[in-house]
From Swiss-Prot:
Lineage: Bacteria, Pseudomonadati, Gemmatimonadota, Gemmatimonadia, Gemmatimonadales
Membrane topology per record: Multi-pass membrane protein
GO cellular component labels: NADH dehydrogenase complex; plasma membrane
Subunit structure: NDH-1 is composed of 14 different subunits. Subunits NuoA, H, J, K, L, M, N constitute the membrane sector of the complex.
The keyword Thylakoid belongs to this UniProt entry's keyword annotation: no
Protein name, as recorded: NADH-quinone oxidoreductase subunit K
Transmembrane segments: 1-21, 27-47, 58-78
């Protein structure tokens, strides 16, 4: 059972990495980062089946950090959209004061 969970976790993490490396939309970038965090959560839960509840504690901590990261990231994306009119990161290469 743990092998299947780790395989699924690795596939989800790889999909997230490919999404982060290939996409330029900020919202898609955050979704891929959340997918990678959920893949790590899945592996923590799979390992906690063998070693007690330590993995579940880490999952709760990672979910808390992910929620804060998502809220802050979306606030930044909204501010970028209001200022530049787009969320495409390739258009934001020039930083002006």
């Amino acid at each position: 059972m743990i092998t299947e969970a780790l395989i699924v976790s690795a596939i989800l993490f790889a999909i997230g990495v490919v999404g982060v490396l290939t996409r330029r939309n900020a919202i898609i970038l955050f979704m891929c980062a959340e997918l990678m965090l959920n893949a790590v959560n899945l592996s923590f839960v799979a390992f906690s089946r063998l070693h007690g509840v330590t993995g579940h504690v880490f999952v709760i901590m990672v979910m808390t950090v992910a929620a804060a990261e998502a809220a802050l990231g979306l606030a930044i994306v909204i501010a970028i959209y209001r200022h530049f009119g787009t969320v495409d990161l390739s258009n934001l290469r020039t930083l002006r004061g």
